[in-house]
Amino acid sequence: TVRPQLVGPLTLLLGAKAEQGSPEGFTPLDRLDDFVKAYQQVLAELAARGVQWVQLDEPGLTVDRDIPNAKIAELARKTYSALAAETNRPAILVTSPYGNLRENLPALLDTGIEALHLDLVSTLYNAEALTAFKDSGVTLVAGAINGRNIWRADLRALLHALQNINGGAVAVASSTSLQHVPHDLDLEDPADVP
């Protein structure tokens, strides 16, 4: 099964810079509505081609910005509510590697997306945050395997910790993209490899 992976619209715009000569006060986030429409079209095209799931990566929602967190959370709620409201689309998995979603977590759980990834390696979430998944109907994709070192993991301890999550459906994943994983273990420090 193919699951296309795209940079999420908020991360794309949060990382963009206004072109020189742009109107005074313009920020790339001012174009969010246009981007949401474009993403809706892409999702519809993917659905028409039989794609069942799409992954939208939103690491931009886990880092500190000059914009208040509450404002970003409201943009996340608005963006993903609009994307999830489309009936002709694949199921949506939003990933949040490299940090804590903070205010964005309840905002995203309230949008209608099907799954939300949390990086459980680089940040801690309290039990209340994890329990919120149960009431939302959103699948928790637990980023519990260190994406930068997948070779070292205490799977028994991990299984025990995941069994204690008082939430709904849980899937296990790496905490981050696997782009940092070496292609050849022979080149790695033996201390990092089991």
For the regions a protein language model found, what residue spans apply to each?
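Domain-level signal for soluble alpha/beta catalytic cores
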Residues: T1-P194
